[in-house]
């Protein structure tokens, strides 16, 4: 008799966890939907730091990707750290009017050293690191 009660209690706990509780939450969501407000007043300042080395083939797509991100422009600093010797710096410089900042270095010291040199200029409360060939979904920063 004890084992039958224990088995029934175990089945009830599992059923509650995987069936009853999710059904109640879904029903509550239908009955009392939450009003969704997009409030950017508490959105932190964010720096998107893109490191680039001879990325002229992909840098323009990366910059377009950065500008298309769903994050308030006044709260987003896009900073490109480049040690490039190809046309990457010239492409990035064309985006200066759109708020993209370029820090170009002529001596190659490697990715870690370049990031370390640029970090003091990052104004964000949060810093997101990215390679030039990594494309983000539009909502990746939220």
Can you annotate each of these PLM segments?
Residues 23-33, 55-68:
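Short, well-formed alpha-helical segments that are part of the catalytic scaffolds
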Residues 44-47, 77:
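Cell-envelope/extracellular polymer assembly enzymes that use nucleotide-activated donors
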Residues 1-40:
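N-terminal membrane-anchoring/stem segments of glycan-assembly enzymes
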Residues 65, 72, 81-90, 107, ...:
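A conserved acidic beta->alpha catalytic loop
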Residues 76, 99-101:
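Short, conserved active-site loop motifs that form the nucleotide-linked donor/cofactor pocket
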Residues 127:
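Short aromatic/hydrophobic "clamp" motif used to bind/position activated sugar donors
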Residues 105-122:
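Glycine-rich, basic loop-to-helix element that forms the pyrophosphate-binding segment
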Residues 60, 87-90, 130-142:
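Acidic donor-binding/catalytic loop of UDP-sugar-dependent glycosyltransferases
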